[in-house]
Amino acid sequence: MSVRLVLAKGREKSLLRRHPWVFSGAVARMEGKASLGETIDIVDHQGKWLARGAYSPASQIRARVWTFDPSESIDIAFFTRRLQQAQKWRDWLAQKDGLDSYRLIAGESDGLPGITIDRFGNFLVLQLLSAGAEYQRAALISALQTLYPECAIYDRSDVAVRKKEGMELTQGPITGELPPALLPIEEHGMKLLVDIQHGHKTGYYLDQRDSRLATRRYVENKRVLNCFSYTGGFAVSALMGGCSQVVSVDTSHEALDIARQNVELNKLDLSKAEFVRDDVFKLLRTYRDRGEKFDVIVMDPPKFVENKSQLMGACRGYKDINMLAIQLLNEGGILLTFSCSGLMTSDLFQKIIADAAIDAGRDVQFIEQFRQAADHPVIATYPEGLYLKGFACRVM
C-alpha cells in the first residue's frame, strides 16, 4: 500500500483546480512513512484520491504534484512522455524563430515540478530544484539519454533553494563531454557566447530573448544605457538595431569580458560599446549628478525578492532604481524595465514605476509590455509560473 498524505477538511480545493503544490498548512496527517522526495498519494480528508506527488517534509511546499491521473506511475516512461510533450512545442518554436537553444522544461508548467532543463546546441543543462526532482534523477536522466542521444548532459543544480529542502548543491558533467568554456549559440540573428559551467543560472537568460529583440525598434541613432548587462545580450541587440552608443554596466569583470567578445563575435563596431564595471545604483547617481543623459535605458536587475518578507524592501529597491533611470532619460526617451521576481505581480510593478516617475518629476507613458519568452510557458493552473514581467515606458 502506498504512503498517503491526507489533507485537512476543505483544503482540497486547489488540487481540484489542478494547482501543483500542497502547502504544509493543508496537511492533516501522513499515513505511512516516506523519505525525502519519495512519491506519495494525496487524498482528501475522506480518503478520496486527488493526486500523486513528491514528498518534502522540511519544505513549506509539502508535496509537489507529478500527476492528477490515478493510473499514471512515476517512472522512466512518465518522464519520457513529459519530455516528448514539451519537445513538440519547442520544435515548432525553434523552427519558426531559428533557435538552436531554448528552455526544454519549465518546471510545473511542463508538468515536471522542480525541474528546469535548458538546451544549448547539443548540451542539456539540468537544474533539479526540489526533493522530488532529485529523487527521480536517475529516471529523468535515463529518459533524456534515450530521447537525446546526441546531447551531453550537464548538472547546474548549484542553487541555494535546494538547501531549503535539505539537499546539497551539485554541479558537473552527468553524461558526455564537458561544455567548452564559452559555447556559441544563435538568437534572432545574434551569435552569443554562453558559459554553461560558471555563468548565472544555466549559463544564459533565455527568457529575455524576445525582449532583447524588441529593444531594436527603439535604439536607432540613440545613446543606450544597459544596466545589469551580464554578458551583453541587450547591448549586442542594441548595436544591431543601429544605436550610436551603448554603455553596459555590471559588477562582474568576467561577464563584461564576455560581453565585449560578443560584440566582436558579431562583427559590430566596438568603438560604439563601452563597458563599465560598477554598482548600478551608485553609477546612476553619479551620472545624474554630473548631468549625463541617455535616450534608451535597459533596466534588467537580478531578483530583489525571494520571499514575502522581502517584498516591501524589494519594492523600494525597484522604485529607487527606476526613479534614477527616469531622471537620466532625455525627453521622449525609452525605459525598458524588468522584474524577474515571481512575487512581484505585473500590476504591482507597474504601480512602482508610476510612483518612481512621480518622484522623478516626470510623466511616463506605458507603451509596451513584456513577459518571458514562449519557451517558458505558463500553465493556466499555475499562475506563479509567470515570473518575468517588463514594460517599455516613454518618458515625457
Swiss-Prot record:
GO terms for molecular function: RNA binding; rRNA (cytosine) methyltransferase activity. One of its GO terms (cellular component) is cytoplasm. HAMAP family: 23SrRNA_methyltr_I. Residues 2-81 form the PUA domain. It is found in: Cytoplasm. PANTHER family: RIBOSOMAL RNA LARGE SUBUNIT METHYLTRANSFERASE, S-ADENOSYLMETHIONINE-DEPENDENT METHYLTRANSFERASE DOMAIN-CONTAINING PROTEIN. This is Ribosomal RNA large subunit methyltransferase I. Keywords: Cytoplasm, Methyltransferase, RNA-binding, rRNA processing, S-adenosyl-L-methionine, Transferase. Belongs to the methyltransferase superfamily. RlmI family. Specifically methylates the cytosine at position 1962 (m5C1962) of 23S rRNA. InterPro entries: PUA, PUA-like_sf, PUA_sf, RLMI, RlmI-like_PUA, SAM-dep_methyl-trfase, SAM-dependent_MTases_sf. It catalyses: cytidine(1962) in 23S rRNA + S-adenosyl-L-methionine = 5-methylcytidine(1962) in 23S rRNA + S-adenosyl-L-homocysteine + H(+). The keyword NADP does not apply. SMART domains: PUA. It comes from Escherichia coli O1:K1 / APEC. Its EC number is 2.1.1.191. Pfam families: Methyltrans_SAM, PUA_3. Gene3D superfamilies: PUA domain (2.30.130.10), RNA methyltransferase domain (HRMD) like (3.30.750.80), Vaccinia Virus protein VP39 (3.40.50.150).
